Amino acid sequence: MLKKSDNKMTDQAYWCVVSGSDIWVNDDQFPFGSAEELGLSVEHAICIGQHQGRKVYWLNDCDVEIELSMVSLRDLLHWPESSFLIASKAIQYGHMTQSMRFCPQCGGRNHLNHNQVAMQCGDCRTLHYPRIFPCIIVAVRNDNKILLAQHPRHKTGMYTVIAGFLEVGETLEQCVAREVKEETGIDVSNIRYFGSQPWAFPSSMMMAFLADYAGGTLKPDYSELSDAQWFDVTSLPDVAPVGTIARQLIENTVDDIRKASVAEQELEH
């Protein structure tokens, strides 16, 4: 539930002012203080939770009269998870209010319903909840190697694991197998859940898996990828940044391979 506060002008609180995928930060942390001290107008400020025992307020930058120094959410991947998730939440709420201004049922004007985390039509009263796009992301292992791919959108040339959107009528496990097959031509088995991460670019939920190579020849789909290779864990390329669940998958797989290698060496001796 979103909460309005009668004390927004004087509350000592953290503030999340967002614009698209950008957020206001001060000295690499959430700005802290009262709205009065920070020069913020609070008519549209909404409490979206707590951080370190203090309220967190969200505002869209269009509701702020002063110019603020904004940074991309991607630049905050080094933040502690609790802080990054709060920033992600604010950005996703901002995206909801900006992308769902009109009701798809009747065309009426939507407004934010503070009792439901949703936009509500002023005419037909239909509630429209935030759009969350489910995606899978998977690290595939083949003995002592990991499958990594390079995407044209990654200008730095980094490599990462395979990912894709869930289709209608599809289980997560089916999606894992399909995406790997479509993008690389290989089959996988032993698909197992690893973890998840909200990914506010603009509103995805990444559901992470581990899988094992089961067969097929690596044939990258060059309409989707720039490259895909099996990499030995001793010679990895530049990979996804720290803070991403892609990096967690890669590190977990590399650790498992190294542990297995050590165990094999101990058995030989």
From Swiss-Prot:
The record's InterPro entries line, in alphabetical order, gives: NAD-cap_RNA_hydrolase_NudC, NudC-like_C, Nudix_hydrolase, NUDIX_hydrolase-like_dom_sf, NUDIX_hydrolase_CS, NUDIX_hydrolase_dom, RNA_Hydrolase_NudC, Znr_NADH_PPase
The UniProt annotation places a divalent metal cation 3 binding at: 179, 183, 224
Residues annotated as binding a divalent metal cation 1: 163, 183, 224
The reactions it catalyses are: a 5'-end NAD(+)-phospho-ribonucleoside in mRNA + H2O = a 5'-end phospho-adenosine-phospho-ribonucleoside in mRNA + beta-nicotinamide D-ribonucleotide + 2 H(+); NAD(+) + H2O = beta-nicotinamide D-ribonucleotide + AMP + 2 H(+); NADH + H2O = reduced beta-nicotinamide D-ribonucleotide + AMP + 2 H(+)
Q: Which terms under GO biological process does the entry name?
A: NAD catabolic process; NADH metabolic process; NADP catabolic process
Residues annotated as domain Nudix hydrolase: 130-253
Q: Which residues bind Zn(2+)?
A: 103, 106, 121, 124
User: Quick one: which residues bind substrate?
Assistant: 74, 129, 197-204, 246
- Might you give the EC number(s) for this enzyme? 3.6.1.-, 3.6.1.22
Give a short account of what the protein does: mRNA decapping enzyme that specifically removes the nicotinamide adenine dinucleotide (NAD) cap from a subset of mRNAs by hydrolyzing the diphosphate linkage to produce nicotinamide mononucleotide (NMN) and 5' monophosphate mRNA. The NAD-cap is present at the 5'-end of some mRNAs and stabilizes RNA against 5'-processing. Has preference for mRNAs with a 5'-end purine. Catalyzes the hydrolysis of a broad range of dinucleotide pyrophosphates.
Binding of a divalent metal cation 2 occurs at: 179
Q: Mind telling me what this protein is named?
A: NAD-capped RNA hydrolase NudC
- Provide the cofactor list for this protein: Mg(2+); Mn(2+); Zn(2+)
Motif interval(s): Nudix box: 164-185
- Enzymatic class: hydrolase
**Assembly and binders:** Homodimer.
Print the keywords alphabetically: Hydrolase, Magnesium, Manganese, Metal-binding, NAD, Zinc
The UniProt entry, under NCBIfam families, shows: PRK00241.1
What family does this belong to? Belongs to the Nudix hydrolase family. NudC subfamily.
Q: Give the co-factor note.
A: Divalent metal cations. Mg(2+) or Mn(2+). Binds 1 zinc ion per subunit.
Give any Gene Ontology cellular component: cytosol
Q: Which GO terms describe its molecular function?
A: magnesium ion binding; manganese ion binding; NAD+ diphosphatase activity; NADH pyrophosphatase activity; RNA NAD-cap (NMN-forming) hydrolase activity; zinc ion binding
Instruction: Show the CDD domains listed in the entry.
Output: NUDIX_NADH_pyrophosphatase_Nudt13
